[in-house]
């Protein structure tokens, strides 16, 4: 049984996949779990894939991907890492890049671990971000900070109507969607969008004036 919580750091450019794995059988089990992405690092996959340089760094416990052809973003790296030691990597395939970890569990035993997907500019920032978040206890604290941050912000305004579904959407969800997908980013897993025009920016900003 695998439970996964996804969230993004409030400060650093890193996304976490916080996992809880349980052996629900009555036998000792050894699991291999892979985390993979299909990187583009450019305008489209067809033009960018041939210029991607992927490297595995054992000291970082991470694979690092760069677009060596892109002059404007030549110093930008994308990395995949884990709080568990990486046992295998796939970096020579054009379609995807992956890391694999191994876990051994006794019957009904549970272990927690995380995968990380992040980006950095230059080696110094890359090393700093990876080393800052290479422990589960640090990621747990980051998760609690993120939850507290959004709870404080989204509880600023509350509505109460006879329609439970309307209350659910208005009390947190719509506000979160506007801030996360329109102001803090330009896309969301559940709703891709966010225009750059003045009118679009204005109407998005007006929605959160009271927050």
Roles of regions detected by a PLM:
Residues 5-101, 124-156:
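Polysaccharide-binding surfaces and accessory modules of carbohydrate-active proteins
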Residues 29, 103-121:
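Short Pro-Gly-centered flexible turn/kink motifs
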